[in-house]
Design a protein with these regions (language model features):
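Active-site environment of divalent metal-dependent phosphoester hydrolases
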Residues: 13-18, 81-84, 122-126, 149, ...
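An N-terminally biased module of ancient metal coordination in phosphate/nucleic-acid-related enzymes
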Residues: 1-77, 83-94, 302, 312, ...
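Active-site gating/metal-coordination segments in enzymes
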Residues: 79-187
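Well-ordered, non-membrane alpha-helical segments in soluble/globular domains
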Residues: 48-62, 93-104, 188-193, 219-225, ...
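Hydrophobic faces of well-ordered beta-strands that scaffold small-molecule active sites
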Residues: 8-12, 74-77, 114-118, 142-144, ...
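Distinct, well-ordered alpha-helical segments
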Residues: 125-135, 153-161, 183-199, 215-229, ...
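H/E-rich (His + Asp/Glu) clusters that bind or coordinate divalent metals
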Residues: 211-326
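Short, flexible/disordered intra-domain loops and linkers
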Residues: 24-26, 45-51, 83-95, 181-189, ...
Length: 326
């Protein structure tokens, strides 16, 4: 097991309010979203002062990341919009947009702490060009949320897109399961079986949230995870949000399936909370007390998973050079 400050968190959201220059967008509906309003309140971000709020979000993230005992860098994730059949941005149906240009700008400012996780909806008409542009700019993965971005990952028309990702060796990090943070239009798009096409085209796929369904006790996608892990050497899953009440059943399943640990990658789903609930009654009291006292979300995620016996890799283990499982 590797120790020290060496992990990369592959699932950290870059949040930003539109400031007139960053190209970001938030719909009126999203501004009224309960979770969105809660996050604004929790991080003390004022929507009336977007530039100040955006910098405060970054400053808070940097402070927590730099204070972590285990995590040295974070992949900042963008969020592409919805695109129509003509491949053009459909702003009317887009709830949240964090542009790749903004992601790349932040990466250039803080290269020691952050890596670029751009977002490219394969439905956009310039999707393949955007893959190459972002790869040239140093992106390390492409993140999508099909439920909210309104595309079917299994659509054969996206084969050239997946081949471009494979060519540029950019992992495809896709949300799996129900989506509650944003407004999911079609929750069936979160079925990991829809990622089979990308895998068949040679793309390295990372299933977010370890393929958990997101509906508390029912984990219907565990067999899919097991099949993909057996069939595809380029399939992985991150452990982001697995301490949440609606997803921690998958974390408990993973305790009983150590053969899957070699496919797990570290992630948190920052800025969402990390809970110690899954550890109650399952770890020594001393360990539980340490988790409760740990306020750093990156370190608590490491602690909960490791104390439960769930091992994982860091992103650089698969995109750079192989390293021992952590």
């Amino acid at each position: 097991m590797t120790t020290g400050k060496s992990l990369i968190d592959c699932h950290v959201h870059l949040a930003a309010l539109p400031d007139g220059n960053n190209g970001c967008y938030i719909s009126p509906t999203m501004l009224k979203n309960v979770l969105f309003r809660f996050l604004l309140w929790k991080h003390q971000l004022s929507p009336t002062n977007p530039r100040e709020a955006n910098q405060k979000y970054l400053d808070d993230l940097l402070t927590e990341l730099r204070a972590s005992r285990h995590v040295q860098r974070a992949v900042l994730l963008g969020m592409d919009g919805v695109y129509g059949s003509d491949g053009r941005l459909d702003r009317a149906h887009t709830e949240f947009l964090i542009t790749n240009d903004y992601v790349l700008e932040i990466i250039r400012k803080y290269p020691k702490e952050f890596l670029a996780g751009v977002s490219i909806n394969p439905q956009r008409r310039d999707a393949i060009d955007e893959v190459h542009r972002c790869a040239d700019a140093g992106a390390v993965l492409v993140k999508v949320l099909p439920n909210a971005q309104q595309f079917n990952p299994a659509d054969p028309q996206y084969k050239p897109f997946y081949r471009a990702l494979a060519e540029r060796q950019l992992p495809f990090l896709s949300h799996v399961g129900y989506e509650f943070s944003l407004i999911g239009r079609d929750q069936s798009m979160g079925d990991p079986n829809r990622l089979r096409l990308a895998l068949d085209e040679g793309t390295t796929v990372i299933a977010a949230h370890a393929c958990s369904y997101g509906l508390i006790l029912y984990e219907k996608f565990l067999p899919t995870f097991q099949e993909f892990a057996t069939r595809y050497p380029h399939f992985y899953a991150d452990i982001s949000a697995l301490t949440h009440p609606n997803r921690f059943m998958m974390l408990l399943h993973l305790r009983r399936h150590p053969e899957l640990h070699d496919r797990l990658l570290f992630g948190t789903d920052y800025p969402l909370s990390v809970f110690h609930l899954p550890a109650w009654g399952r770890v020594p009291f001393r360990s539980l007390r340490a988790m409760i006292r740990t306020k750093n979300r990156f370190d608590r995620q490491v602690s909960v998973c490791r104390e439960l016996g769930v091992k994982f890799h860091s992103l650089d283990d698969i995109v750079m050079q192989p390293k021992p499982i952590r």
